[in-house]
Amino acid sequence: TFSYTMAFWDWTRWEKEIDWMALHGINLPLAMVGTDGVWYNVLSKLGYTKEEINDFVAGPGFQAWWLMNNLEGWGGPNPDSWYKQQIALQKRIVKRMREYGIEPVFPGYSGMVPHNAKEKLGLNVSDPGLWNGYRRPAFLQPTDPRFEEIASLYYKEMNKLYGKADYYSMDPFHEGGSVAGVDLDAAGKAIMQAMKKNNPKAVWVAQAWQANPRPQMIGNLEAGDLIVLDLFAESRPQWGDPASTWYRKDGFGQHDWIYCMLLNYGGNVGLHGKLKHVIDEFYKAKE
């Protein structure tokens, strides 16, 4: 719900939220502020101009969907002051989280590249298609010899700004992204290997949402290297409940998973909905 609620928060609001997290035992929050600054530096080193970078990086209100590979450039361009401001803000956020023993989850490298990366950089990419009419970023094929190079550059720039994390979120092919021509097993392994090269003890955090994560992409990954967030578990669980409209016969296989509840989708108020279902699904999952 980052872009529903938190897109324009300043340090005063984030400080309050992090204190609230600590008081309520939340120890694994998404920390994606300032990822646009990482991408700015990465693309600069790959030869993109400021204008080209801003054609790729989404505006403040749309960065959640950008980082889930759904769109690019929408809501931009961002002024230079925005990047500087968000980098400084993320440094304060991460510092406070770590002081409290909270593990930030940084956006990792999922294979995303600008839609024009084939023409600009000569990369072997696939086209994931459109998302609700928006052009998606391209997906860098795991067989491209520069996959490891670009992933390493991404993590290097992330580390420079915010240090290494032990958890990274990556959600390629989110909400119907086309996987035509993509070896999903190889893609999962390439994404995992790039993360592990950066930090051997890091864990990939993926959202279970609609068809993601694709079973073929995670089926041959080692147990313990991936945590799946069953994001809508109170309503459409994927852990293996046959009654669910998002039923997965084998759940998440060998991988650890977390029962999550979306409830209000961020910032909405009101007590309504399938209240009995909310309670029952949790205990059904525990069984």
Identify the residue ranges that each predicted region occupies.
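Catalytic-core regions of glycoside hydrolase
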Residues: 4-5, 22, 27-69, 75-287
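N-terminal hydrophobic targeting/anchoring segments and the immediately downstream early-domain regions
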Residues: 1-16, 28
